[in-house]
C-alpha cells in the first residue's frame, strides 16, 4: 500500500469520526429534554379466550390490562350448559402461572363465586354449579396470570342455556350466513326476508331484512371469507337470540382484481319448539372497503373509496389539496401536491394480519386538518395494540405531515367498557395542537388539561345534562354560566380552539337554555320564569317561548316563536332541528305536534368533496372528488412512525357523581345513551334492541315478554296510585314511591312499546290529558287492559285506541 493511499484512508477515517461525533452531538442537543424516539406501533402481546358451545367457538374475548367496571361490561353473553363452561385459550406466546374466575351480579355489587385454576394449557373448564350462580344473568370475570407480565382480564355476561335453544339458533345462523355468501338458491335466504318498497336496493354497503334477495346474497361480488368469522352472541333469552359475525372478505374488483372488506353481520332469530322451526326476526349487514394504497386508489377525478358509508368522515386543508379520511377504522392522509398517501393510524393494516388487531371496538374521530395538512384526531375505545394495549380510553394524536410522524399527546384512561368510552368520552373531547390543551366534558364537569405542564383543572362543575351542549366536532361548548336550569340568565359559548368566549343573555324574568349546534351556529331557547311548570307526567320543565339561532359572529340569523305554543326540547340531525312542543293548561304542559326547522348555513366550499356514483358490479360507491382533478395516479405510499415517550401522559376522571343513564344496544353495538327512559326505548325499538340502566338492569327488551299478561295481587298498590292521582299528586312521584325510588317517563312511546314494562309487574299510568288518567294493568296480543280511577273494573281497548286516548297528553305514560 502506498504512503499516499494510507494518508487518504487516515484522513477519511478522521472525517468519518468527526461526522459521527457531530451527529451524536446534534442529536443530543435537538432532543435534550424530550425523551422520545420513533418506532412502529408494537405488535399485540395479549392472549385471547373464547368459549365452546357444542361444535361452535363463540365469544372470542379481548383481554384488558386492568380490572374493569363490572356494571359496564355488556358486550357479549355466553350460554352455560350443565352448569359448566369450556374456555379456550389462545396464548400467542404467553406462558401462564395459573388462572382464576369470579362471578358477579349484573351491577357488580355482589360476588357469587371465586375459584382458581392451577393449569391453564390450551383451555380449562369453569365450574358454575355454585348456589345462585346461574339463577339469572351474571357477569363472569376470567383472569389469566402471565409469567413475567401483568395479568390479563376478560369479561362476558353468562346465563343458563335452559329453554334458549342455542344450538338450533346457531345452526340456523350458520346456514343462512353460508347460503347468502354462496348465493345458494332455495335454501331459505330469500324466504326469510321482508322486502319493502322503501329499502335501498342500490347499495351493498348496508343491507337489511327489508332488502331484496340479490342484495342480501352480495350481488355479483362473489365474496370469499378470509381468516374465519368471529361469532359474538349479543343477547340471549328464552324468546330470541342476537348474534353478530365480524369477518373480512375478498371480493371481485373493478379497478383491481380483488378488493377486501370489513363486514359486520347481525342476526336476531327465534326458535319455536312446537314447530321445530327457527325464524329470522332481524338481519343487518354492513361492509366497508379496506383502503389499500398499494393498489389502484386514484383516478383522474379523485380518491376511490369504493363501497363505503356515504357519510364517511373526512377533513380537508384550506387550499383543498390535502385530505384526511377514515375508512374501515383506518385513518389515511393524501397530499396531492407531493403525490403522497399515508396510513396515519390503524391497528390492522396490510402488513399486520394478526386477528387480534382486527377487533373494531374503537372509533377514530377527526378533529382538525390545518393549512399544512397536519391532522389532529382521537381514537376512543379499546386499544388493540401499542403503548396502551388492553386499555380503554381516548387517545389524542397529532400527525405531523412534514416529519411523517404521529405523536400521542395524551391518553384519557377509563375502567368503563369500550362502548361507553366511545359514546361518552370520545364524543365530548377536543384537543387543540396550537395551545396543547385538551378539553373534555365528564358527567357535567368541563375539564381543561394542559399538555405542557400536565395540569388538569375543572372550568365548570355540576352541570346537568340539559345545561350544556357540544358541537359535533367538539370545538364549541355552550353552557349555562350562572344559576341552574330554571334560573340561568347567561350562556357561555367557549371556542376551545381559540380560547375565545361569547356571552348570550336573556331579559329580566327570563332564563336561557342551550339546545345545540348546527355546524358552528348556536341554537338556544328563552323561557319566562313565571312559565316554569310540569309536564303531564309530573316532570319539571322549562318551557321556552322562543328559539334563536346565532352565528359565530354573534348575529341572530333565525328566530322561532308561535303564540300559545312552548318548546320543551330540541333534537338535531345534520341541518334539521326537531322541536318537541307543548300547549299550556294552568301550570301543566301537554305535548302537541312537533315542528321542524331547517338551518340554511352554507357549507364551506372546498376543492374536495365526498360524492357517490354507481357501477354495475359494486353498485353505489364513494369517492373523494377533486374539482381540479388528479394528474398522477400512482402516489408514493408512506407509513408514519409513532413518537414514543418514556413517560406518556395519562389522565383519569372521576365519575362517582354520574347521573342515571340509559344505554341502548342494538344490531350488535351501542346505539345511544339517554337520560330519559322513553327516549331510549324509542331508539331501541328502531334497532330491535335492549335498554339497560347504569347498573345493567334491563329497562326494556324487544320481544322478550309474554304474549298475554295481567297484573294481579297488587290491589293495594293500585288503590294507592288511584288515591294519590285523585289528590292531583305528580304521577312520576307516585310511581317512584311504589317502585322503590324508580320511575320511567315513557312520554312519546306507543302503547305497544310499553307492554314490556307492564310485563315486569309494574302498573303504568296513562295520562288522557293534563288532569285525567287511567292505569294500564295488562294486555293481550292486540289489546291493552286498564282500570279507571273510580273503580276496579277492567276495560280492554286496542293498542291504537289507547294511543288515541292519550293523544291529548302527548302520549304521556309513566311506568
Model features per residue range: what roles?
Residues 336-339, 401-403, 450-454, 495-499, ...:
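Short loop/turn segments that connect beta-strands within beta-propeller blades
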Residues 30-49:
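Ser/Thr/Pro/Gly-rich low-complexity linker/stalk segments immediately outside membranes or between
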Residues 17-19, 23, 27-35, 71-86, ...:
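Surface-exposed, charged secondary-structure patches
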Residues 240-277, 284:
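Exposed beta-sheet edge and beta->alpha loop/turn motif
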Residues 113-116, 282-283, 341-350, 406-414, ...:
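Beta-propeller fold detector
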Residues 710-815:
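Conserved active-site-adjacent core of cysteine acyl-enzyme catalytic domains
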Residues 44-45, 50-102, 109-110, 137-221, ...:
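Core segments of small alpha/beta cavity-forming domains
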Residues 2-20:
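N-terminal Sec-pathway targeting helices
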Amino acid at each position: 500500500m502506498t504512503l499516499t493511499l494510507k494518508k487518504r484512508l487516515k484522513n477519511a477515517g478522521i472525517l468519518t469520526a468527526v461526522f459521527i461525533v457531530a451527529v451524536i452531538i446534534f442529536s443530543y442537543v435537538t432532543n435534550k429534554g424530550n425523551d422520545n424516539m420513533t418506532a412502529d406501533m408494537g405488535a399485540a402481546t395479549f392472549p385471547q379466550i373464547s368459549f365452546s358451545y357444542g361444535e361452535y367457538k363463540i365469544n372470542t374475548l379481548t383481554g384488558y390490562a386492568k380490572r374493569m367496571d363490572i356494571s359496564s361490561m355488556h358486550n357479549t353473553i355466553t350460554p352455560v350448559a350443565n352448569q359448566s363452561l369450556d374456555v379456550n385459550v389462545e396464548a400467542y406466546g404467553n406462558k401462564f402461572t395459573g388462572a382464576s374466575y369470579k362471578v358477579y351480579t349484573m351491577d357488580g355489587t355482589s360476588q357469587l363465586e371465586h375459584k382458581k385454576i392451577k393449569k391453564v394449557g390450551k383451555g380449562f373448564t369453569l365450574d358454575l354449579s355454585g348456589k345462585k350462580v346461574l339463577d339469572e344473568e351474571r357477569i363472569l370475570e376470567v383472569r389469566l396470570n402471565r409469567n413475567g407480565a401483568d395479568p390479563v382480564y376478560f369479561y362476558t355476561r353468562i346465563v343458563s342455556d335452559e329453554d334458549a335453544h342455542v344450538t338450533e339458533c346457531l345452526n340456523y345462523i350458520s346456514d343462512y350466513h353460508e347460503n347468502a355468501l354462496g348465493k345458494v338458491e332455495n335454501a331459505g335466504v330469500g324466504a326469510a326476508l321482508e322486502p319493502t318498497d322503501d329499502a335501498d336496493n342500490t347499495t351493498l354497503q348496508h343491507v337489511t331484512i327489508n332488502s331484496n334477495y340479490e342484495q342480501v346474497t352480495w350481488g355479483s361480488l362473489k365474496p370469499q371469507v378470509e381468516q374465519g368469522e368471529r361469532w359474538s352472541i349479543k343477547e340471549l333469552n328464552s324468546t330470541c337470540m342476537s348474534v353478530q359475525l365480524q369477518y373480512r372478505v375478498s371480493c371481485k374488483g373493478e379497478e383491481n382484481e380483488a378488493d377486501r372488506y370489513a363486514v359486520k353481520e347481525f342476526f336476531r332469530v327465534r326458535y319455536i319448539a312446537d314447530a321445530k322451526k327457527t325464524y329470522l326476526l332481524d338481519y343487518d349487514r354492513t361492509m366497508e372497503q379496506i383502503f389499500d394504497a398499494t393498489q389502484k386508489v386514484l383516478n383522474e377525478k379523485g380518491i376511490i373509496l369504493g363501497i363505503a358509508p356515504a357519510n364517511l368522515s373526512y377533513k380537508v386543508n384550506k387550499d383543498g389539496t390535502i385530505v384526511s379520511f377514515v375508512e374501515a377504522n383506518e385513518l389515511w392522509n393524501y397530499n396531492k401536491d407531493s403525490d403522497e398517501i399515508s396510513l396515519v393510524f390503524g391497528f390492522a393494516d396490510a402488513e399486520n394480519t394478526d386477528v387480534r388487531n382486527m377487533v373494531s371496538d374503537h372509533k377514530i374521530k377527526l378533529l382538525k386538518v390545518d393549512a399544512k395538512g397536519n391532522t389532529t384526531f382521537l381514537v376512543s375505545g379499546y386499544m388493540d395494540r401499542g403503548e396502551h394495549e388492553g386499555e380503554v380510553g381516548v387517545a389524542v394524536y397529532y400527525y405531523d405531515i412534514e416529519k411523517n410522524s404521529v405523536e400521542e399527546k395524551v391518553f384519557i384512561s377509563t375502567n368503563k367498557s369500550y362502548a361507553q368510552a366511545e359514546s361518552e368520552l370520545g364524543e365530548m373531547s377536543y384537543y387543540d395542537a396550537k395551545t396543547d390543551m385538551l378539553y373534555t366534558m365528564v358527567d357535567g364537569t368541563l375539564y381543561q388539561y394542559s399538555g405542557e405542564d400536565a395540569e388538569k383543572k375543572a372550568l365548570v362543575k355540576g352541570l346537568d345534562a340539559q345545561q350544556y351542549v357540544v358541537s359535533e366536532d367538539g370545538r364549541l361548548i355552550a353552557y349555562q354560566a350562572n344559576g341552574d336550569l330554571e334560573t340561568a340568565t347567561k350562556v357561555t359559548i367557549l371556542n376551545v380552539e381559540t380560547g375565545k368566549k361569547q356571552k348570550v343573555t336573556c331579559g329580566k324574568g327570563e332564563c336561557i337554555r342551550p339546545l345545540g349546534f348546527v355546524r358552528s351556529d348556536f341554537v338556544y331557547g328563552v323561557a319566562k320564569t313565571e312559565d316554569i311548570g310540569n309536564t303531564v307526567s309530573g316532570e319539571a320543565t322549562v318551557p321556552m317561548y322562543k328559539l334563536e339561532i346565532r352565528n359565530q359572529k354573534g348575529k341572530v340569523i333565525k328566530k322561532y316563536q308561535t303564540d300559545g305554543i312552548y318548546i320543551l326540547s330540541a333534537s338535531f340531525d345534520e341541518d334539521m332541528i326537531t322541536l318537541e312542543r307543548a300547549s299550556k293548561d294552568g301550570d301543566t304542559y301537554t305535548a302537541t305536534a312537533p315542528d321542524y326547522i331547517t338551518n340554511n348555513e352554507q357549507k364551506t366550499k372546498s376543492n374536495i368533496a365526498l360524492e357517490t356514483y354507481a357501477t354495475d358490479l359494486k353498485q353505489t360507491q364513494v369517492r373523494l372528488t377533486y374539482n381540479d382533478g388528479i394528474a398522477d395516479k400512482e402516489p408514493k405510499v408512506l407509513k408514519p412512525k409513532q413518537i414514543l415517550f418514556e413517560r406518556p401522559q395519562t389522565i383519569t376522571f372521576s365519575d362517582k357523581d354520574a347521573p342515571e343513564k340509559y344505554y341502548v344496544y342494538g344490531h350488535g353495538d351501542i346505539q345511544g345513551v339517554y337520560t330519559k327512559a322513553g327516549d331510549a326505548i324509542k331508539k331501541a325499538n328502531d334497532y330491535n334492541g335492549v335498554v339497560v340502566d347504569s347498573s345493567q338492569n334491563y329497562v326494556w327488551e324487544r320481544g322478550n315478554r309474554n304474549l298475554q299478561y295481567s297484573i294481579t295481587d297488587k290491589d293495594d298498590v293500585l288503590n294507592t296510585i288511584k288515591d294519590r292521582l285523585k289528590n292531583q299528586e305528580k304521577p312520576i312521584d307516585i310511581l317512584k314511591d311504589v317502585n322503590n325510588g324508580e320511575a320511567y317517563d315513557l312520554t312519546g312511546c306507543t302503547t305497544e312499546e310499553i307492554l314490556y314494562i307492564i310485563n315486569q309487574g309494574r302498573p303504568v299510568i296513562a295520562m288522557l290529558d293534563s288532569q285525567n288518567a287511567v292505569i294500564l294493568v295488562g294486555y293481550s296480543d292486540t289489546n291493552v287492559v286498564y282500570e279507571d280511577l273510580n273503580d276496579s273494573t277492567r276495560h280492554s281497548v286496542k293498542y291504537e285506541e289507547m294511543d288515541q286516548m292519550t293523544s291529548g297528553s302527548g302520549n304521556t305514560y309513566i311506568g
